[in-house]
């Protein structure tokens, strides 16, 4: 297993912001898989979805994870919200490092991203219902991949970061490993 901390969770769960702040606290590099894909493809995630479709984007996520597995170490990796839905991605994530699931309630997600037009999967008539449906469909994938689960709804970013740091330290201690 690589010495990375991987942040997974639904869109709007705080993965990107937590990843950046956690990287400062732990003196680790932060990598956002969506940003890597956008840079490599020369398009935003929304544009990839629109032009190529979701399945093409999911394949790009798999290729990105494989590249990180081949090259990356001692990083905070912030995933796209749908990355764990593919079985092959879940297998790669387990090899990449410690997976932390930032769990959040549907209403919290909706409140955070209701005005964000860059979320292609939420451009629909009833975004809150879509969030509920998608979270239900992804729940098992998130939970089966996670080594650590943090419920983030009522927490500040500093509280989340401290919980992650403490949980990762305990995880390492319990397994005799070290990042």
Give the positions of each predicted feature.
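Hydrophobic anchor at the beta1->P-loop junction of P-loop NTPases
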Residues: 7
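NTP-dependent small-molecule kinase module
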Residues: 2, 21, 25, 98, ...
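ATP-dependent small-molecule kinase phosphotransfer cores
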Residues: 32-83, 87-94, 119
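A glycine- and Lys/Arg-enriched "phosphate-lid" helix/loop adjacent to the NTP-binding pocket
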Residues: 96-139
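ATP-binding Walker
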Residues: 13
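Short glycine-rich anion-binding loops that position phosphate/pyrophosphate groups of nucleotides
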Residues: 81-83, 105-107, 155
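P-loop (Walker A) phosphate-binding loop of NTP-binding proteins
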Residues: 10
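Walker A/P-loop
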Residues: 16
């Amino acid at each position: 297993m690589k010495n990375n901390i991987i942040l997974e969770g639904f869109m709007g769960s705080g993965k990107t912001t937590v990843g950046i702040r956690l990287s400062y606290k732990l003196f680790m590099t932060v990598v956002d898989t969506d940003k890597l894909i956008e840079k490599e493809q020369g398009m935003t995630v929304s544009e990839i979805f629109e032009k190529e479709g979701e399945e093409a984007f999911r394949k790009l996520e798999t290729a990105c994870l494989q590249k990180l597995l081949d090259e990356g170490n001692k990083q905070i990796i912030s995933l796209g919200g749908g990355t764990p839905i593919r079985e092959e991605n879940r297998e790669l994530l387990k090899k990449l490092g410690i997976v932390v699931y930032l769990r959040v309630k549907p209403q919290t997600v909706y409140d955070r991203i209701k005005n964000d037009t860059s979320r292609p999967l939420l451009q629909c008539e009833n975004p809150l219902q879509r969030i509920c449906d998608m979270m239900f469909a992804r729940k098992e994938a998130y939970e089966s991949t996670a080594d650590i689960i943090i419920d983030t709804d009522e927490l500040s970013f500093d509280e989340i970061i401290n919980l992650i740091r403490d949980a990762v330290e305990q995880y390492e201690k319990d397994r005799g490993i070290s990042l």
